[in-house]
Structure formats: structure tokens, C-alpha cells
């Protein structure tokens, strides 16, 4: 009996050793998996730190640098979006029952429309008090982050030896046939701003768009190029030698991309307009959206706008060195004020009349 017990003990010992080794291996593997999951957990959480912005295209206003800085500073990823102002509002309206976007960037007259349509909500971000009263909605539905002045963004190498145009009248000359581009004013805010600028410069008002519409009728004979969205790359390539656009795009091309370009403020006059941001009503990542809005008005965010040759709403963010690269103040004196609220009221009806004229 003792020998049988001894033989049993001897036979069972290797089995216990094998089981122990298996258990140890499994435990070790489990610890490795647990450690790996723990290491991945912060990254997974970080990946969820997203804010969706409508109308934040990388080629426009150097949103590329701004979005990169937002992620570095806050950990929030903001995907690029190439909608224009009109397309953004249409999308927000279509998504009202189940919003997708958190924040939206708009031309100022489009912001009035967004408020009327009920697709944005109030939020007064950090540095709210630094924004001039005429550059924000008093309740906080929208606020300016920067502004630009309308003019001609000219690729001089693509002019084929022709002189740089200096006036709205110049663009109607046969020598510039097929050379002038502008964004569709029935959809893109910059296109509508250009229409308001030429109309006002030629003696029109927001109650009388006939001078501007007559100019578009004449320009139609000169075969203009009318893209739907930002056309910076097409100017740089020479496809569009002359684009009705803001000063900041031309300065970016000249000073950052070292292109042979010029910005012209037409001699008859123009306008300067603000661009604004808003928190989307029902934003799915509302807290992240608010952080984005805080950042674009922060010292760092405003300096980035200034470095991209936009006029930051917090004027002290622009350095003297950057300001010196702009055209002289005497040229900017030709940019006249406009009633942005009324500009918003007239945008839809102007768009309809423009389409009738051009089609």
C-alpha cells in the first residue's frame, strides 16, 4: 500500500509541474494583454477627442495650421471640411434632428441666416470681452475671429505680359477674357461679398443691386471662371490668373509660397468683412466644440490668424513686422463699411437675381 502511494505520488508530481508552468504562462500572457490594453486605453480615449467643424478647409485662411495647433494644445482632432458658408448652413438644416457638426465657420452675413434658421446656439468664449461690440452677436450666437478685405488676387506670371488690372472696369476689358475668376455668389459667402463690393463701388446699395448685376452681365461676355469653393491652388497654378478674393490669400501666396503675385484693392473701392464662428445647436461633442472656440480667440490662435495675414479680431495679436507686409493704409482706406445685418437680409434675393442674369 505504501509502495502504491509512493508510485502515485511519483507519477502525479510531473503533472503538477506541467500544470503550474501552464498556469504561470497563462497568467503572464494575461498580464501582458492587460498591460497592452492599459497602454492602448489612453490612446483610444484620445482618439475620441474630436470636434467636427463645417467650413474649415486647409487651403483657406490657413486653417491647416490652426487645426494642427488645436490638436497639439487641446488634444482635440478637427477634421478638415471643404464646404462653403452656404453649403454648411444647408447641411446644418438637413441635420437638425441629429446634428453632426459641433462648430461652424461662416462669413458674417451667413451667421445671421444660421441664427434665423435655429442651427446655432449661444456661447461666449474666452476673450469675449476683447471682441468689439459690432463684431459679435450680443447674445453669443456668433463672434468674429478675423476679417479680410476684398480685392484682386493676381498671378502676374499667368497674365501673359498684360498689365495688372487696377479697377473693376479693367476686368471687363477684352484683354482679360477668360482670366477672371470669382466664387459663386449664390452659394459661397466670399462670392457674395465680392458682389456687394463691386456693387457698392459702382454706386449701388444693398437696396439697389443694379450696378453690380450690370457689371456681372458685362463680365459674362468675358468668359469668367466660377468655382464653387476656394480656388487658391488654381490661382497658384495659373489656371485662374485673376481671382476676386481676400488680401490674406494673396499675401500668403507672396510671402509664404514665394509666388509672383500681387494683391490689388480696386480704385473704385471695396469692402472689408468679418468671418465668424458659432457653436452648433445640439452639438454632439459640445464640450470639445467650446474648447475649439476658446482656442481660436486665444493669444496663440489669434497670432496664427495674424501670421496667415488675416486681421485678427484682437488687433494686438498682429506684430508690426506682419502689419508691414500689408498694402499701405491709404489703399485700405478705399475699403468702405457695410451694414452686415442688411447684407444678410439681401443675400438670398441677390443670389436669385444673379442666377437669372448669368443663366
Residue spans of the language-model regions?
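N-terminal secretory signal peptides that target proteins for export/translocation
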Residues: 1-21
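Early extracytoplasmic/lumenal segment of secretory-pathway proteins
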Residues: 47-113
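Extracytoplasmic ligand-binding site segments that recognize negatively charged/polar headgroups
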Residues: 56-64, 100-239
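A ligand-binding cleft/hinge motif common to bilobed small-molecule-binding domains
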Residues: 109-115, 236, 241-260
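Short beta-strand->loop
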Residues: 120-129, 142-143, 169-172, 241-242, ...
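Periplasmic-binding protein-like
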Residues: 130-133, 148, 213-218, 224-225, ...
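A bilobed periplasmic-binding-protein/Venus flytrap-type ligand-binding module shared by bacterial periplasmic
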Residues: 151-158, 196-201, 273-286, 304-305
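Mature extracytoplasmic/periplasmic domains
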Residues: 280-338
Amino acid at each position: 500500500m505504501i509502495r502504491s502511494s509512493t508510485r502515485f505520488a511519483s507519477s502525479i508530481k510531473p503533472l503538477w509541474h506541467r500544470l503550474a508552468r501552464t498556469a504561470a504562462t497563462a497568467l503572464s500572457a494575461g498580464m501582458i494583454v492587460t498591460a497592452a490594453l492599459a497602454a492602448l486605453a489612453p490612446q483610444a480615449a484620445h482618439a475620441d477627442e474630436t470636434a467636427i467643424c463645417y467650413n474649415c478647409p486647409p487651403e483657406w485662411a490657413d486653417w491647416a495650421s490652426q487645426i494642427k495647433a488645436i490638436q497639439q494644445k487641446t488634444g482635440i482632432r478637427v477634421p478638415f471640411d471643404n464646404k462653403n458658408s452656404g453649403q454648411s448652413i444647408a447641411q446644418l438644416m438637413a441635420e437638425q434632428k441629429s446634428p453632426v457638426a459641433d462648430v461652424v465657420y461662416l462669413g458674417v452675413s451667413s451667421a445671421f441666416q444660421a441664427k434665423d434658421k435655429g442651427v446655432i446656439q449661444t456661447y461666449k468664449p474666452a476673450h469675449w470681452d476683447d471682441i468689439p461690440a459690432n463684431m459679435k452677436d450680443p447674445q453669443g450666437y456668433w463672434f468674429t475671429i478675423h476679417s479680410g478685405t476684398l480685392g484682386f488676387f493676381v498671378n502676374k506670371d499667368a497674365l501673359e505680359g498684360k498689365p495688372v488690372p487696377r479697377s473693376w472696369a479693367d476686368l471687363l476689358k477684352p484683354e482679360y477674357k477668360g482670366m477672371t475668376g470669382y466664387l459663386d455668389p449664390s452659394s459661397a459667402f466670399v462670392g457674395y461679398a465680392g458682389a456687394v463690393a463691386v456693387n457698392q463701388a459702382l454706386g449701388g446699395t444693398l437696396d439697389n443691386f443694379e450696378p453690380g448685376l450690370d457689371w456681372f452681365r458685362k463680365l459674362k461676355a468675358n468668359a469668367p471662371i466660377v468655382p464653387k469653393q476656394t480656388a487658391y491652388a488654381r490661382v497658384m497654378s495659373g489656371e485662374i490668373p485673376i481671382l476676386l478674393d481676400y488680401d490674406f490669400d494673396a499675401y500668403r501666396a507672396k510671402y509664404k509660397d514665394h509666388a509672383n503675385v500681387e494683391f490689388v484693392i480696386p480704385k473704385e473701392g471695396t469692402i472689408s468683412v468679418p468671418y465668424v464662428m458659432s457653436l452648433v445647436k445640439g452639438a454632439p461633442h459640445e464640450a470639445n466644440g467650446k474648447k475649439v472656440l476658446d482656442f481660436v480667440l486665444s493669444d496663440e490662435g489669434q497670432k496664427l490668424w495674424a501670421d496667415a495675414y488675416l486681421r485678427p479680431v484682437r488687433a494686438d495679436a498682429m506684430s508690426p513686422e506682419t502689419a508691414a507686409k500689408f498694402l499701405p493704409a491709404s489703399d485700405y482706406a478705399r475699403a468702405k463699411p457695410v451694414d452686415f445685418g442688411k447684407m444678410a437680409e439681401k443675400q438670398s434675393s441677390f443670389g436669385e437675381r444673379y442666377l437669372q442674369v448669368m443663366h
